[in-house]
Amino acid sequence: MKDYNKILKSDERAVFDLLDLYSRYGYSRFKSGKFEEYELYARNRDFIGQDAILTFTDSSGRLMALKPDVTLSIAKNSSDEPGVVNSFSYNDYVYRRSREDRTFREINQTGIECIGDIGSYDICEVILLAVKSLETISSDYVLDISHMGIVRGLIRELA
């Protein structure tokens, strides 16, 4: 078996290790195209937090956008059945404007999305995977959880 660690750059190894981690926890790989219809992002501007999105008109006249976000593509393509949890991992490029120089950048993102009828187990698993993801990248990390419901639950359990 080939030792790919010798030929992969450190960021490529990290992506490979992260996707392997997510796969071991049962997350299905999600892959989408580089663009979506602009309307998806226009309806969800507050979620995206972007004031500018790269757009173009395709050959059939539809206004399209280079993806500024992966989550919305996953949500759009997920089943919405009651009682079902959709767990996806992804490694994809998004296109966002830089805060520093206001130019657009292609950014590689790797992560997970857990969508649907989510319970306590799913929330704990996502937090666990956040910790394991950070450990994969570096031993020097801080995990900041700012959801008040989770923080209250942790405080209640620790008290």
Tell where the protein language model's regions lie, with residue ranges:
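TRNA-recognition modules of translation machinery and tRNA-sensing kinases, especially anticodon-binding
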Residues: 1-159
